[in-house]
């Protein structure tokens, strides 16, 4: 009886001890989950923050580089525009291989001996000197020999033509003489047939002198 009363009195005095223990256990379990969750979240937050900062720095660097390139290009364009507007021309320096020999042409044009080459190029000593240099000696000898041979052939041809012409003249002369003699003989024969004799006047003169 005494024990029953003591248990009841203890329960009356401590009616919520079990609830307190359960709540404490639940609180402990929830606290551990919260601690675990907070650890993962901090790790993820750190990773995301690091990625964001890195990506932001790269974007800033790209923006700065693009801005610097843009500023440089605009400055170059503005400089070119100012030089073009001011009328300044940039000298173009060609290499020596691309000058196309203009200096030599200028020297030739400034030569006094070539001033009258349009009207009389043969009289210019420069032109005659160039012709003498440009014609090799072998070609000159060939030209001289060929001209000599051609001249001889032409001379021989002219001589043969003259001989032929002379021969033809002689032949025609002989033919004319023969024809004349034949005509005279024919005339004499006609006179003789008529009873007349042809006597030269000199014979008559001599005959009269003798008489």
From Swiss-Prot:
InterPro entries: VUP. Disruption phenotype: Collapsed xylem vessels in the inflorescence stems. Expressed in vascular tissues of cotyledons, rosette leaves, sepals, petals, anther filaments. Expressed in roots, inflorescence stems and developing seeds. Plants overexpressing VUP1 exhibit severe dwarfism with extreme short and round shaped organs, and display extreme longevity before senescence. Residues 1-40 are annotated as: Disordered. The keyword Acyltransferase does not apply. It is found in: Cytoplasm; Nucleus. Disulfide bonds: none annotated. One of its GO terms (cellular component) is nucleus. Residues 1-12 have a biased composition (Polar residues). Residues 13-37 have a biased composition (Basic and acidic residues). The keyword Mitochondrion does not apply. It comes from Arabidopsis thaliana. The lineage of its organism: Eukaryota, Viridiplantae, Streptophyta, Embryophyta, Tracheophyta. Involved in the regulation of xylem development and growth. May regulate secondary wall formation during vascular development by modulation of brassinosteroid, gibberellin and auxin hormone signaling pathways. Coiled coil: none annotated. GO terms for biological process: xylem development. This is Vascular-related unknown protein 1. Keywords: Cytoplasm, Nucleus.
């Amino acid at each position: 009886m005494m024990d029953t009363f003591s248990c009841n009195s203890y329960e009356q005095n401590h009616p919520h001890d079990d609830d307190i223990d359960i709540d404490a256990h639940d609180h402990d379990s929830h606290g551990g989950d919260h601690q675990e969750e907070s650890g993962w979240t901090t790790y993820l937050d750190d990773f995301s923050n690091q990625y964001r900062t890195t990506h932001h720095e790269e974007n800033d660097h790209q923006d700065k580089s693009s801005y610097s390139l843009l500023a440089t290009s605009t400055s170059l364009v503005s400089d070119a525009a100012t030089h073009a507007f001011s009328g300044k021309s940039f000298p173009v320096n060609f290499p020596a291989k691309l000058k196309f020999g203009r200096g030599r042409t200028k020297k030739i044009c400034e030569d006094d001996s070539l001033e009258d080459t349009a009207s009389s190029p043969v009289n210019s000593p420069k032109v005659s000197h160039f012709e003498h240099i440009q014609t090799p000696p072998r070609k000159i000898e060939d030209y001289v020999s060929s001209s000599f041979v051609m001249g001889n052939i032409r001379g021989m041809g002219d001589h043969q033509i003259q001989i032929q012409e002379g021969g033809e003249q002689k032949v025609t002369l002989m033919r004319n003489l023969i024809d004349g003699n034949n005509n005279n003989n024919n005339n004499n024969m006609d006179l003789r047939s008529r009873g007349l004799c042809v006597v030269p006047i000199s014979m008559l003169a001599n005959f009269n002198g003798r008489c």
